[in-house]
Amino acid sequence: MPELPEVEAVRRGLERHLVGRVVTGVEVLEPRALRRQEGGVEAFIRGLAGRRLEAAVRRGKFLWLPLDDGRALSAHLGMSGQLLVRGTGPATSARGQEPGPVGDAPAADAVVADPSVPRVDLTATRAPSLVRDLSVRPRHLRVRLHLTSREADPHPQAGAALDLVDQRMLGGLRLSEMVATSDGASGGEGSPQPFLPQDAAHIARDLLDPAVDHDGVLARMRSSRRGVKALLMDQELVSGVGNIYADEGLWAARVHAASPGRSLGPRVGRRLLEATAEVMRRALKVGGTSFDALYVDAEGAAGFFARELEAYGRAGQECRRCGATMQRQVIGARSHTFCPRCQRRWGTSS
């Protein structure tokens, strides 16, 4: 499942290519992609009609596009979901009409998928997606939003599209009402506004968020009997960390995943949070971690942090720090890779 660096790479691509555009048409090829939408497909299409995309915002792994009516288009990527930007040539809306200027788009309509259109898998392609022909559809396309052009485009006459591609159908889109943040700070990365979608209100701030309360996170971890890795991956405690970056942060901080939170000393606890944040910063610089074509950014480009992983997926290999053989253990139904010499279970009290 994409974690913070991978979702942030997607957010940055959406911010570059989509902010300021207006929805001119909606194609729903798989209604299950909207299963979380109140009112179903019709409500989704009606709610997006003529709406401007105001920003691209992320908190942890949660991503949303605020709209000009005060709501947001929320995206849950699940295990295999992708948001891909596409566009070419003089764009037309779903009704075959030429799009008007930004802010004066025709209403969005549903479009029935054309079975005669070739289904070509472009998910692994690294070429800039905005030059792709919109008539080419990726294999697992579920929803497509047709969008107007904007003045900053290299080819202003060209429209664009946002595709939800999802092989396993565990992700989806929905329109959400916005609510105020509990602390009055920004909802997330990408917007200064103190609002976030209602369905993300329970999601904690992530370790790269300037407004995160590190002392508060550490205090809650140190009061818990649960294992440290489970705490790092609790999205209501601190968001954005999944299996990959939990293993990497624990290795960097020399902490064993099964050590209870209450065994963390203040110094080690701070070291763990700082190490996990630093690993994610490094991953973000190279686009995150991609193990296959399912993990790409909004332009279809893969990340390269897999080359720098120190723990995750390295069971049986030498620890690059001490030379011991890395081991794999299942903790709480999740695989954990660690160094038995560097990460001793109870060595966290300092």
Question: Language-model segments: what does each one mean?
Answer:
Residues 1-350:
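Structured catalytic/nucleic-acid-binding cores of DNA maintenance enzymes
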